Each structure stands twice: as C-alpha cells, then as structure tokens.
Swiss-Prot record:
GO cellular component: BRCA1-A complex; nucleus
Residues in MPN domain copies: 7-153
UniProt-listed GO biological process terms: attachment of spindle microtubules to kinetochore; chromatin organization; double-strand break repair; mitotic G2 DNA damage checkpoint signaling; mitotic spindle assembly; positive regulation of DNA repair; response to ionizing radiation
Coiled coil: 208-262
The family this protein is said to belong to: Belongs to the FAM175 family. Abraxas subfamily.
Region (Disordered): 365-405
UniProt modification remark: Phosphorylation of Ser-402 of the pSXXF motif by ATM or ATR constitutes a specific recognition motif for the BRCT domain of BRCA1.
Function: Involved in DNA damage response and double-strand break (DSB) repair. Component of the BRCA1-A complex, acting as a central scaffold protein that assembles the various components of the complex and mediates the recruitment of BRCA1. The BRCA1-A complex specifically recognizes 'Lys-63'-linked ubiquitinated histones H2A and H2AX at DNA lesion sites, leading to target the BRCA1-BARD1 heterodimer to sites of DNA damage at DSBs. This complex also possesses deubiquitinase activity that specifically removes 'Lys-63'-linked ubiquitin on histones H2A and H2AX.
Protein name, entry field: BRCA1-A complex subunit Abraxas 1
Length: 405
C-alpha cells in the first residue's frame, strides 16, 4: 500500500523577516519564496509481512524575495510581465518554490485574481508544485495594541487548492533535537567559498566523501577475508562432526559388547554357586564341634554362599591332612612339643614355669618351619586350647600356652 503526504517547514528567521516587512508598511506586500522540495519514502513492515510505503514530500522554505510594490510583475487581470519578473528573480528562477502575499483585515481565502496569477506562474516557471503562502493580519483591540497574524500554505491539487501543514521551526522546538532529514537554510556565500576551496580534500567529483569510499573499500576487503575464514571453519566443523560420529559409533559398539558379555558370561557366573571346600569344612566341624565357626561360610573364590553347610562329609580328617602336608612338617620336635604341652597342663608350681621357658625357646627355633601348612597348625593348636580349657576351667589366672590366632 502506497500513500503520499506533504508538509512544509518555514524558518523562524524567514517568518520574522516577513512579519517585520508587513508591519513596517501601510499597504499589502508580496514576493517570492526560495527553497527546495525533497521526497522521502518510508517503508513500514507489519507483522503480516506486508509493506506499507509512504512517500513524504517536505517543502523547505529557506529565503524570500520581497516586491516593494504591488502589481510589479503582473496586471489587474493576473497576466504576467515577464521582463519585470525576470528582473526580480535575476537568475534564481530554479530556486523559486512559491510566492506569498500579505493582506490586511481579510479572510484566509484566495481571491480569483490570485488563483489566475498562480496558474500563470506555474506555466512560466514550469513548476506544477508551486505553493502560495497567504498571511493575513487584523486588529484585536480598539487601541490597536494587539494584532492577530494568521498564515496558511496553499497548494493546487486536482484543480483545487488544499492547505499544506506548515511548521515554523524555532530554537525551542523538540524537532530540532532529533535527526534532520531535510537540509537546513541556505548557507552564506562566504561559507560556500570556504567549502569549495577545500572540497577536493574531502569529496570526489561526484560529491561522495573520500572517507566513506575508503571505509567501503575496507569493508569489501573484510568481507573477502570473512568468506575465506568461513570456508576454513566449514571444513573444520565437518571434520569435528565426523569425529563425533565415529566416537558415538565406538561408544555404541562398546555398549553392545558389554551387554553381550553380561548376557552370556556375566549372568552365568552369578547363577553358579561357589564350590565348597569339603576338607576345610570337615576339619572345622571336627575340631570345633561346639563353636560358632560351624556356621561360617567359606568358598574358593571368597564369595558368600546362599546356604550354610551342615552336612557331615564322613572324612577322616587326619588321613586326608597327612596326605596333603609334607613329611618335614611332622618333626620329632613337634611331636615332643605336643606331648609336653599336654603334660604341662596338669602340673603346677615352679617346674611348670621352667618348662614354659623351654617350650617358648623351642617355639622360636621352629617358627620358620610352620609356614607350609596353616590348616594343620590351626587344627593342632585349636585342639590343645580346647583340652586345656576343659581340664582347668576354674584357673583363670593361669597363663595361656596356646598360640593366639
């Protein structure tokens, strides 16, 4: 959807000069307006992705050329006096955007003569967008101390004159604090000469800034470098993606192998019961019939069985143990040592202490020979300890001669 709108800007200095000229004379005044017209397209995109383009035309009135006498360039019928008009404009014909007229004690309505004159000016100046500024003044009080000044900007549109919104710019207006989309007032001739002298240092012949051109060149170079970097980054990202895919595949393969191992071998090991050490079980049952050790659970792999063994295997433990140990383990000294221990339990007094010392010496001499078969020593020492406890249960102060384990 496209639309058009027109607005006008009038400098505060120009408006002040027009008012001063009008109030300084006793008759009506008229003249020409200089400036330019600029168009700006505003594109608004809504949520429905529809473009709303509006073209805004801004009429910037920058200067004025006064005519110090009425009917100076036209007659009473509204016909133009071209030589007089050319003399008044004097080469500024292209800068004319309209004309103005001050009237006293009248309404804000264009007269028929003014309409004819405006039409003739459009044809002579070849400007169909020519505007007409009408200013009227009236006395508000009987003492003529207060005047009312009205102004309106008229523009022909489709055969009719329509009023155009006119804004008189001033230092106190908020619009001056924002960005200006139109040019300011006409610069002085001295400023124009200074800019023209140093123009070649900042501008090219086409009017573009040199710094802007250099920045654009740097921007293009950065874009080329960025394209190269993007291609390198793309290659690296693809390699990383490939590596991540391989890693995920390896992880899946490891998980499959673990699952297969658990389903095939792991579950089988968990279901199998550990084998029972029958010889050790029978030995513990023989030498510790009334001890809590008969409920202990022993296995080859050190794992706890679900059930406790309470079966008598009917194995002659002494025969089996004799076959399992070496001959050097059963020396004469050990046989004598066992006999002496049994006799020593029944004796009391100083002789028993001497025998105890001799037995301790014998134990230290034969200590290195006791590492071959731990099960035999455990059974013999445990049996001797049980016999001593049964023979002398009340003598709690007597020193224990059995080894502690």
């Amino acid at each position: 959807m496209e639309g058009e709108s027109t607005s006008a800007l009038l400098s505060g200095f120009v408006f002040g000069a027009l008012a001063f000229q009008h109030l300084s004379t006793d008759s009506d005044t008229e003249g020409f307006l200089l400036g330019d017209v600029k168009g700006e397209a505003k594109n608004s995109i809504t949520d429905s992705q529809m473009d709303d383009v509006e073209v805004v035309y801004t009429i910037d009135i920058q200067k004025h050329i006064p005519c110090y006498q009425l009917f100076s360039f036209y007659n009473s019928a509204g016909e133009l006096n071209e030589p007089a008009l050319k003399k008044i404009l004097s080469g500024r014909k292209k800068s004319v955007i309209g004309w103005y007229k001050f009237r006293r004690n009248t309404d804000q309505i264009m007269t028929f003569r003014e309409r004819l004159l405006h039409k003739n000016l459009q044809s002579h100046l070849s400007n169909q967008g020519l505007v007409f500024l009408l200013l009227t003044s009236s006395v508000m009080t009987e003492s003529c101390s207060t005047y009312r000044l009205e102004h309106a900007l008229h523009r022909p549109q489709e055969g009719l004159f329509q009023k155009v919104p006119l804004v008189v710019t001033n230092l106190g207006m908020a619009e001056q604090q924002g960005y200006r989309t139109v040019s300011g007032s006409c610069a002085s001739s001295g400023f124009v000469r200074a800019v023209k002298q140093h123009r070649s240092e900042f501008f090219y012949e086409d009017g573009s800034l040199q710094e802007v051109h250099k920045i654009n060149e740097m921007y293009a170079t950065l874009q080329e470098e960025l394209k190269k970097m993007c291609s390198d980054v793309e290659v690296s990202e693809r390699s990383v993606e490939k590596l991540l895919t391989e890693v995920s595949q390896l992880k899946e393969e490891i998980n499959r192998k673990k699952q297969h191992k658990i389903s095939s071998g792991g579950n089988k090991d968990q279901l199998e019961e550990p084998k029972e050490n029958v010889l050790l079980c029978q030995a513990l049952r023989t030498f510790f019939p009334s001890s809590d050790l008969q409920t202990c659970i022993v296995s080859f792999k050190g794992r706890i069985s679900k059930n406790c063994c309470k079966i008598d295997h009917n194995i002659n433990i002494m025969d089996k143990l004799t076959l399992m140990v070496e001959e050097r383990d059963f020396t004469e000294a050990e046989t004598k040592l066992v006999t002496k221990r049994k006799v020593r339990v029944t004796t009391t007094g100083p002789k028993s202490l001497k025998k105890l010392r001799s037995l301790q010496l014998d134990q230290e001499l034969h200590q290195d020979e006791e590492d071959c078969n731990q099960e035999t020593k455990l059974a013999l020492s445990s049996a001797e300890t049980d016999e001593e406890a049964l023979e002398n249960p009340k003598d709690t102060n007597e020193y224990s001669y059995s080894p502690t384990f």
